[in-house]
């Protein structure tokens, strides 16, 4: 299939549609930056949350069919663990603990590390292209290319989905996934 070059406006619309934003509301490039940041942070949060769930279920021996941890939330031990340990733990440390519990494929670990890196740059900087790792190219790199392009954002979403599906299947089994 031939690659079609999109102009900035067409690419902005395609990115917005890819992440489910009403394109009639986008007014300029800064709006696209906000959409992109929202998508990156959302995917990061989903992965962070499922890593946390794997850790909680391991340490508190909670079966996969128990939802929302209602019984566990009634205990002080669980509340302290979640609020003072898990909530303050960064994603790479959560991944490290999950890897200690059981192996995580290298490709999934690499995806999670890339997602963490790009989320860090976008969430902590108004101009992530000026960070030292991006300054030479002026791009916000994800897997070696600018995540602000439609193709790279597609790869980011596919990668995030791959990581999430692996973690979900590890936790609940593939039969419980709602595709």
Give, region by region, the residue ranges found by the protein language model:
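Amphipathic alpha-helical interface elements
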Residues: 1-99, 103-117, 121-135, 151-179
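Conserved C-terminal helix/linker of AAA+ ATPases
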Residues: 138-139
